[in-house]
């Protein structure tokens, strides 16, 4: 039912609608007098930069977009209509920078900036405390030849196949907060402060931490599965474990294997405390350390939310999130296929798994945004097809 402009009597309260187009959706009305139940409220401009305090009953507003459902008076039903094809010609398939349809709707942040920063700082502090214990354990092992603390960290703070074999499943989580050296710790902490704070600000503390820890565990699982495929001492047994899942949930008692000696990989810095393990494959004694899978997941969610946002890589190179993350995913996936993990001592498969986990998580966290993007892209493609047919 259409409403003529002459029946709308209420005016605009300090409208700032000069260059930024603002759109709302007017619900269906029975009579023109029903407009009196509306109240003025603040809406965001399409550029996300300015605010406009307007009256919803103003006849000057285009009836095109919609605001979040919670901002409209609860007694009035909404008619969720969306036009996927924008007005005006387009030269490129991708929309311009900071386009409204590729960004999440404003005003839907689940946390405050102070809480988001506090959560990121707490995660960084936990990483620092765990790294301090690792450094203290290495120092005691090298200088004092006291391996008690070092053996405890190797047993409970790193993810390895042998730890899972002995039932220490929590190492999949604790290893996310462990790091190899100071450079590894600093790089991950900078990334955590940059990306995790934004994810917490957008989705809230519990959802953000669930994605963070879930991506870290998933990355460790994929990397350990790759190690298990390389060397498996139980491969010849009829009921032996063939997957990491079998170690987490054993079907029955497996044959005992000898305990590995102190082992920290092939880093020459810790040569004096490295020992070879008897009857235990190297891949089973090698542990995984680091929060790279979780960090890549938060970076992937950030790229999905704000693909045209630029950030400085290593504080030097400005890159766009929507361009850098796909290129990095392809590069690390190629390195996984070429088996460069042992050469660089980097779990590239954990990075790839974390990125994949972040993208899939964004599909569940913001389904409306992905639906809007798909409709928008389909509309552009159809419009191009129709224009080409018209020219032909």
Curated annotation (Swiss-Prot):
It is an enzyme of class 3 (hydrolase). Its EC number is 3.4.21.-. Pfam families: Rhomboid. The chain crosses the membrane at residues 115-135, 150-172, 185-205, 208-225, 277-297, 299-319, 321-341, 350-370. One of its GO terms (cellular component) is mitochondrion. Its main location: mitochondrion. SUPFAM superfamilies: Rhomboid-like. Gene3D superfamilies: Rhomboid-like. The active site is at 292 (nucleophile), 351. GO terms for biological process: signal peptide processing. One of its GO terms (molecular function) is serine-type endopeptidase activity. It is a multi-pass membrane protein. It is found in: Mitochondrion inner membrane. Residues 1-34 form a transit peptide. Keywords: Hydrolase, Membrane, Mitochondrion, Mitochondrion inner membrane, Protease, Serine protease, Transit peptide, Transmembrane, Transmembrane helix. Belongs to the peptidase S54 family. This is Uncharacterized rhomboid protein P4H10.10, mitochondrial.
């Amino acid at each position: 039912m259409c409403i003529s402009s002459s029946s709308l009597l209420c005016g605009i309260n300090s409208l700032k609608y000069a260059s930024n187009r603002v759109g709302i959706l007017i619900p269906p009305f029975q009579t023109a007098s029903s407009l009196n139940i509306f109240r003025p409220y603040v809406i965001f401009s399409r550029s996300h930069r300015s605010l406009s305090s307007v009256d919803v009953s103003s006849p000057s507003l285009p009836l095109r977009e919609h605001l979040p459902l919670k901002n409209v008076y609860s007694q009035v039903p909404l008619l969720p209509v969306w036009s996927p094809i924008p007005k005006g010609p387009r030269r490129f398939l991708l929309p311009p920078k900071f386009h409204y349809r590729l960004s999440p709707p404003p005003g839907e942040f689940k946390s405050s900036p102070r809480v988001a920063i506090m959560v990121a700082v707490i995660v960084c502090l936990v990483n620092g405390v765990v790294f301090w214990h690792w450094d203290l354990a290495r120092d005691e092992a090298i200088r004092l030849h006291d391996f008690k603390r070092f053996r405890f960290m190797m047993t409970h703070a790193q993810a390895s196949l042998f730890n899972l074999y002995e039932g220490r499943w929590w190492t999949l989580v604790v290893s996310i907060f462990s790091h190899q050296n100071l450079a590894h710790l600093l790089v991950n902490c900078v990334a955590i402060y940059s990306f995790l704070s934004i994810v917490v600000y957008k989705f809230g503390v519990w959802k953000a931490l669930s994605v963070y820890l879930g991506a870290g565990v998933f990355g460790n699982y994929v990397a350990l599965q790759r190690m298990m495929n390389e060397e498996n001492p139980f491969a010849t047994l009829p009921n032996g474990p063939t997957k990491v899942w079998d170690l987490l949930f054993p079907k029955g008692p497996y044959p005992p294997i000898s305990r590995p000696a102190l082992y920290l990989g092939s880093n020459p810095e810790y040569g004096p405390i490295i020992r070879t393990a008897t009857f235990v494959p190297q891949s089973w004694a090698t542990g995984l350390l680091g929060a790279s899978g979780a960090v890549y997941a938060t970076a992937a969610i950030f790229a999905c939310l704000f693909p045209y946002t630029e950030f400085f890589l290593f504080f030097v190179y400005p890159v766009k999130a929507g361009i850098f993350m796909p290129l990095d995913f392809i590069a690390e996936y190629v390195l996984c296929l070429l088996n460069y993990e042992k050469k660089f001592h980097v779990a590239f498969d954990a990075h790839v798994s974390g990125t994949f986990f972040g993208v899939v998580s964004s599909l569940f966290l913001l389904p409306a945004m992905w639906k809007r993007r798909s409709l928008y892209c389909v509309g552009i493609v159809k419009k191009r097809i129709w224009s080409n047919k018209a020219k032909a």
